[in-house]
Amino acid sequence: ECLYAQAEKKLEEIAFDEYSEVLFISKSVGTIIASAYAEKYKIKCCQILYTPLEQTFMFEHDDAIAFIGTADPWSDVKKVIACSKNQAVPIYVYEDANHSLEKENILQNIDILKNVMEKTQKYLR
C-alpha cells in the first residue's frame, strides 16, 4: 500500500488523457502497482511486465507483454503463466532464470538479456 501511495503521488499531476500513447514498464511488485493504477484511473496503456507476480493479474491487461524465469523464487511461476495466458498476455519464459532473469552463467545471462530486449523492441513497434 505504501509503494502504491508513493506511485500515485508521483503520477497525480500527469494528465494521461492528453497523450495518444501511454506505456508502463514495470518489474516485480511494480507490475502490481502499475496494473492497479492503470485500472483505477482507467488509463488505456501498453504494459511491459518484467517478472510479474501472481497478484499482477488481479487487474485486466488489454495490451501487455510479460517475461518470467522458471526459477523465480518470488513468483508462483505456473500460476503467473496461467494467469497471463488467461488474459491473452504473451509471456516469455526463461528456463532456470531467477527473479532477475539471470542464471549462474554470465554468457547465458547476456543471451537472455538480448532476447528480452529483442522481444521488448518488437512489442514496441
Model-derived features with residue positions:
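Acidic catalytic loop of the alpha/beta-hydrolase fold
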Residues: 70-75, 99-100
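Conserved alpha/beta-hydrolase fold motif
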Residues: 23-24, 47
